[in-house]
Amino acid sequence: ASFIVMCDGKTVLPLATSQDHKRLLDADQGPNTGGMGAYSPAPVVTPEVHARAMREIILPTIKGMEKDGIPFTGFLYAGLMIDPQGHVKTLEFNCRMGDPETQPIMARLKTDLVDVLLAATAPHSETRFDDFELDWDRRTAIGVVLAAHGYPMSPRKGDVITGLPQDTDDVVVFHAGTHMQGGQVVTSGGRVLCVTALGGTLKLAQQQAYDTIQGIHFDGMQYRTDIGYRAISR
């Protein structure tokens, strides 16, 4: 699971949990990628696992950096391995948000992100994160990545993208590997778009995302059809 927090140098503000899908093909087959989709929240991160991750991994890391004279301000992303007993191990740290985990997280975040960033970087004399609370949409969000032909080895560029929908309150198409060329949107990287949708259940969010994808087209477009399957099968 992806465990992302915001830090102001002392205090930690956890973001919503998320789970991504690294393999290119359905059923976790094919080569590894930067991520072919994600959903939030991640049921595998139970309240007990969340508390353990904060207690055993996140807080000691932040306090350790402060003790070493390098207090950390910004996003800290911990890639976690969670066993069936709920024990948590850290696979990696990144000083950034995750892609595509961020897209469903942002879809659920009701608090203005600018307010969060300003609070994190406020002068030390001010409250900062001590009394800061994030407001989340209680619904589930899912993001499905549309990748270019040849991804992840040698993604093709320049394919014209058609059928891009207008964003709504429940569906947003995030651009990544796109470029304007001759008045048309074309592919310019491996992971091209991330179609993100909200739903009352993961199944409903999944259906909304895949229904939207049906209207989008570019030559060689590839995507997984099972994003969210882990949570649905739990």
How would you describe each model-predicted region?
Residues A1-M106:
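Internal nucleotide-binding/catalytic subdomain
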Residues A53-L76, N94-D170, Q181:
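Active-site "cap" helix and flanking loop/linker of ATP-utilizing ligase/carboxylase catalytic domains
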Residues L24, M36-Y39, F129, I161-L164, ...:
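Short clusters of hydrophobic/aromatic residues that line enzyme substrate/ligand-binding pockets
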Residues L25-A27, D130-E133, T178-V185:
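Short beta-strand/turn micro-motifs at beta-sheet edges
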Residues N32-G35, F72-Y77, P84-H87, R138-A141, ...:
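A generic structural signal for well-ordered coil/turn residues at beta-strand boundaries
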Residues V5-C7, L146-A148, A197-G199:
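Short beta-strand-to-loop capping motifs
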Residues T178-G182, V186-R234:
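Generic C-terminus detector
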Residues G34, V144, A205:
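Residue-level signal for inorganic ion chemistry
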